[in-house]
Amino acid sequence: MTKQKKDQRAADGAGEGSGSQQLLLTIDVEDWFHVENFRQIIHPSSWPSFESRVERNTYRLLEMFSEIQMPVSVNYERSFDFHNNYTLSYPRSPLPGVKATFFILGWVAERMPRLVREIHSLGHEVASHGFNHELAVQCRLEDVKSDIIDSKKLLEDIIGGPVYGYRAPSFSINENILRLIEETGFMYDSSYNTFSANSRYGKVDLSGSENVGVAKKISSGFYELPISNIQWAGLVLPAGGGGYFRLYPLCLFALGVRMMLRKNSAYVFYLHPWEIDYGQPRVREASKLSRFRHYVNIDKTMGKFSAFIKRFENYRFPTCRQYIDGL
């Protein structure tokens, strides 16, 4: 590597990090028509009539993770063909390196159990994103409980083992729902987003909980793992991923992550499979704001995500459960 390239990598933060610093990559597995931005246009009863693209996009993410963590010598095997002859290849056995936690919507898992098993077999974590992608804070508690239990049971039946984590759709959480999540047997929740300017995000009071790494210890066997944001001058700046990752220049976003990792041992990032899919249908009936939120820089996300991970190649990429087990 030339001196000029080394200097540039140093300026970008490449090569930074140690074995104790960790990036928790989380993927909310839902389709483009499930999002809250389009809820007034696309009713849940019509979901089956739309082209599903979540399977293809999730496999693209799996392939990217496997390519990044490849040892020098490894045998690739082909996955099954998708519509329009789309194929992927990656190792068939779990390998050390980049692992992620996939919060899978029950609606998706019910229709695509093979995808769930594939995620699990590659060593990633299968977690719950609820069943029907409704804002939990707007639902009756008994309905939320049924949604949570149904999604957990479905995922556990598919992978043949326990599911430890939950994330509410659109981070719609409150203290009553948090108690429900604990009562239904999860080890952790990852629904709390401290950025309060988004009205969909819920609120919980964690001031009485013990700080353990970047997690909050709610009880002896239950943790909250909040989305990472920048705390600056009494403000919360959104820097956990999703649309904010697509909106900010990569150099600025990575700088924010490094700032957080100087204060904390871990960083929690989130993304959706539809955010890497420039070819998805356009919902032109949605408002300008909703369309901006959903489509901004969507053509650049895949390459940007890969570049983001490579900037932190000297860090560890465990699953959420692995992180909590190590606390």
Regions found by a protein language model. Give the residues of each.
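Catalytic alpha-helical scaffold of carbohydrate-active enzymes acting on polysaccharides/glycoconjugates
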Residues: 2-165, 170-232, 252-327
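Surface-exposed cleft-lining segments at the edges of enzyme active sites
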Residues: 163, 237-247
